[in-house]
Amino acid sequence: MRGFLIALLTLSSGAFAQQALVIPDTLSGKTFNLRMHKDSVQWFQGKITQTLSFNEYKYLGPTLILNKGDEVNISVKNEIGDTTTVHWHGLHVPAIWDGGPHSPILDGETWKPNFTVLDKASTYWYHPHFDKKTALQAIKGAAGLIIVRDKEEAALTIPRTYGIDDIPLVVQCKQLDADNQAMPRGMQDSTVMVNGVINPFVNLPAQFIRFRLLNASGERSFNFGFSNNKSIYVIGTDGCFLKHSTQTTRVRLSPGERAEILINLTGMNSQSLYLMSYASELNMGVQGGPTMPMPPGSPPMDSPLNGIDFNILKIQVVAQNINAITSIPSSLVSLSPYEEKNASTTRIINITAKDSLTMDGPFYFNDSTFDMMRIDYFIPLNSIEIWSITNKSMVAHPFHTHDVQFYILDRDGNPSPERERGRKDVVLIEPNETVRIIMKFEDHADTLVPYMYHCHVLMHEDDGMMGQFMVVPANSSSIPRVEKSTFALYPNPSSGRVLIDLNNVSIKPEILVEVYDSKGLHLMSIIEENSNNKSLDLDLSSLVDGLYFFRINGQNYKYIKAN
């Protein structure tokens, strides 16, 4: 299948005719080439919708298949007319290749990360992560799935024929404006799609089917279930398989969360059922649940989908395949959750807002908004930590950590549901709830580039609900705990000539400017006499375009050179 265009098919009632679910193509191997570009689709009558996508696609991108232990090389070409990044959501990679806001890809440039796949078999994804533009770019469609395979998963007798009995489902809900353009702040979202298809159907054989569920919405949580409350067998969380499959009828996923589930269609040939969201069962305060009463002057948040049950995907059951999977194993994989007694540190994070009635943000971690120049936590390599996150706001927040997967210790002191007891990187924290997570920071240390933690409601993230941690060598007691640099460099980005504001730099006979590239390589030192000038004019046009780190009299700053 090559670049798909969602055809406009309407009924006289204005409803969408059902359309076949599109299964994204896969890319596999050890070398991957991605090209992020502008495109468009015709979802509704009238103006076409402008999108961002990867490779030949008009919306979303291919599914990347990685094998644990492989060293992979990825090339990402930016052709969107703006700066972006690509974050490998859930993957345990070095900070320099994580794709956070410190790894900008300038328009027309190519970013070439390479790393060894250290993750367990599961479903991950990739999407933009540029500061203050994540929602704008991701909501337009710049995203795709990542499947990691390993030997443990390969030994299990479970469905794994991609597109036949192993089905990727990228579920989104978005708000379009009067011109049919996706709105990054979609609090009245009502357009539900799966793999970029509105009102989709899929033909599936009468046997066990594996769904890889991703909630790629900007803010809406889904309470997944099937019509007639058909049993769901949860086999995997964000970052691994569970020890045993867990039977349930509901799987709640907030933005960024994934789950791997099985359903048994044996004996259902010629029957139909629906994947649904039972949003009427979500608690108030969870975006997608019943709309909360709003204080005067608040923006509208009354999506017609809030608090109601609705269909997402129609499943039409067809004849069973040869070699069909008709049972599931009693046990899956071994897990070794970290023990609380081995934690060296407990960090307290409070989710706050400007006042108790705030519904639309901004929201904060410990009353602080995101600052690229502030490192919130320095974490020694190989340490095990507990993070206790308390939501003191009126709305639920999906809390996401980069770099590592965590285990949920408890929710308000109670064990989490069995389906949440695998490795995770996103956890939904409801109003007035405290969730404790435990994680180990291993393999990757970097004293220049931090990792992020943030809310995965994208407009909350872009409004500053994000913090940074840096994993440092265990013996790095000399790493300075600088909360914020006392000098400023501008314009940033620039084409090469920059002005450094020295108003708050400590007075010394000489001013030492040191420049490093994004890999920590020292490029140059510039020594200037301190003539009591309040600024320093530097010509850095000899540097190639990219990300640079400055140290001025021992203080750190980041700089992006762009033409």
Per-range role (PLM):
Residues 1-18:
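Bacterial Sec-dependent N-terminal signal peptides
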Residues 227-239, 392-422, 458-459, 471-473:
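Active/binding-pocket-proximal capping segment
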Residues 18-255, 261, 283, 292-355, ...:
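Histidine-centered copper-binding motifs that mark active-site loops
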Residues 67-71, 205-208, 381-384, 492-499:
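Short coil/turn motif common to extracellular beta-sandwich-like domains
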Residues 122, 207, 383, 449, ...:
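A glycine-anchored, Pro-Gly-centered beta-turn/N-cap motif
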Residues 6, 16, 480-490, 494-563:
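C-terminal outer-membrane/trafficking sorting elements
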Residues 121-125, 268-275, 444-452, 546:
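Short glycine/proline/serine/threonine-rich loop/turn segments at secondary-structure transition edges
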Residues 347-408, 425-448, 454:
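C-terminal substrate/ligand-recognition segments
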